[in-house]
């Protein structure tokens, strides 16, 4: 998930740290957890549970989230945050437009926008 200013959040321990100590915001399709880190870049992780559907569906939702983030958010957030997006079950029927709108809404509600 290497975008211009973002790296991937990969380790389970990193995800757990963000869940435990981070702030969360939610809407119909997604939940976002945000935690300030001590680096000069942001890290993003995406979690899609098996409750969402089979592998094809989960991967589709993951791709939609990645693309919406890449197109709209990557350049517009302050560096130095760990961000985790969690897809809700309702996201399996969502279109790209729905996910895109959802991500924009969540980021606007947080204080990570430039």
UniProtKB/Swiss-Prot annotation:
Name the coiled-coil region(s). none
Respond yes or no to whether keyword Cytoplasm is given for this record: no
What's in the GO CC field?
Answer: ribonuclease P complex
By its UniProt entry, which InterPro entries does this protein fall under? Ribosomal_Su5_D2-typ_SF (IPR020568), Ribsml_uS5_D2-typ_fold_subgr (IPR014721), RNase_P (IPR000100), RNase_P_CS (IPR020539)
EC number(s)?
3.1.26.5
Does Amino-acid biosynthesis count among this protein's keywords? no
Record field: catalytic activity: Endonucleolytic cleavage of RNA, removing 5'-extranucleotides from tRNA precursor
Report the GO molecular function annotations: 3'-tRNA processing endoribonuclease activity; ribonuclease P activity; tRNA binding
One GO BP annotation here?
tRNA 5'-leader removal
> What keywords is this UniProt entry annotated with?
Endonuclease, Hydrolase, Nuclease, RNA-binding, tRNA processing
Q: Which HAMAP family match?
A: RNase_P
Q: What does this protein do, in the record's words?
A: RNaseP catalyzes the removal of the 5'-leader sequence from pre-tRNA to produce the mature 5'-terminus. It can also cleave other RNA substrates such as 4.5S RNA. The protein component plays an auxiliary but essential role in vivo by binding to the 5'-leader sequence and broadening the substrate specificity of the ribozyme.
| Membership in a protein family | Belongs to the RnpA family.
Q: What does the subunit comment say?
A: Consists of a catalytic RNA component (M1 or rnpB) and a protein subunit.
Q: PANTHER family, per this entry?
A: RIBONUCLEASE P PROTEIN COMPONENT
From the Swiss-Prot or TrEMBL record, give the protein name: Ribonuclease P protein component
Q: What is the native source organism of this protein? A: Clostridioides difficile (strain 630) (Peptoclostridium difficile)
